[in-house]
Design a protein with these regions (language model features):
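Mobile, glycine- and charge-enriched loop segments
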Residues: 1-2, 153
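Catalytic domains that recognize anionic headgroups
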Residues: 2, 9, 16-21, 27, ...
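Structured beta-strand-rich core segments of catalytic domains in phosphoester-bond hydrolases
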Residues: 2-5, 12, 18-109
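Stable alpha-helical elements in mature extracytoplasmic
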Residues: 3, 7, 28, 32, ...
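Generic structural signal for well-ordered alpha-helical scaffold segments
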Residues: 8, 86, 145-149
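Glycine-rich, phosphate-binding/catalytic loops in enzymes
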Residues: 35-39, 113-115, 173-176
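Active site of divalent-metal-dependent phosphoester/diester hydrolases
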Residues: 44-61, 128-152, 156, 161-206
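A solvent-exposed, charged loop/short amphipathic helix patch at secondary-structure junctions
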Residues: 111-130
């Protein structure tokens, strides 16, 4: 589609050696490798996708650097996960974690519609979704952090954390690492503007 083409054009323009994508969706899982190869020439793709009736979605890591190993960290009762790739450049070895922590799964348009219609059932369901996400995410974070702690090489963490810089998620994932945006960015660095124009929930920890 034109939208997908414009996104891939932007990604290619960044000229990054490693790219981490979350919530990547494709209708035909069988065509994923050829699709990525056509859009991201020169990159090797590592991924884990959850198949569904309407397609497949998951995490994708694209790399121009040699990949010496890979793995996944699946979360209990969740369609979210983390994948990692091991790399070797000269004598330097390191691992990149590509994380997607529990989402709230809340429809903004659905909330607005419920507000106008005074639909209390939707608000009750929203509360249940928020509670589930708030309970699951710290467990997922601890699971990834435990894997990082046992990692024999330097680890970098990227991903959609679905949490703000004042959260337990952020505190845990910055242990022993620096927030790349704080080190080199400026302004608020919003990555999700639908609910709040200054919300940052996506990170690169180095």
């Amino acid at each position: 589609s034109q939208c997908a083409d414009s996104i891939f054009a932007f990604i290619n323009a960044q000229d990054a050696d490693i790219i981490c994508l979350q919530e990547f969706y494709l209708k035909d899982l069988q065509k994923l490798k050829s699709y990525l190869a056509s859009k991201m020439k020169g990159y090797r793709a590592e991924y884990y996708m959850f198949p569904s009736r309407n397609g497949a979605f998951g995490n994708v890591t694209l790399s121009r650097l040699p990949v010496t190993g890979k793995g996944k960290i699946k979360f209990e009762e969740s369609a979210n996960l983390a994948i990692y790739t091991d790399h070797k450049v000269g004598d330097c070895r390191f691992r990149v974690y590509n994380c997607h922590f529990e989402s709230y799964n809340i429809s903004f348009t659905g909330m607005v519609r419920a507000l106008f219609n005074a639909d209390t059932d939707v608000f009750a369901e929203t509360g249940t979704k928020m509670k589930r996400s708030i309970l699951r995410r710290p467990r997922q974070v601890d699971q990834v952090f435990s894997d990082i702690e046992s990692c024999p090489v330097e680890a970098f963490v990227c991903g959609d954390f679905n949490d703000n810089p004042m959260s337990y998620t952020y505190y845990r994932m910055t242990r022993g690492r620096k927030d790349a945006f704080v080190e080199s960015g400026e302004g608020f660095g919003a990555t999700y503007s639908l609910l709040w124009p200054m919300l940052r929930i996506d990170y690169v920890m180095v």
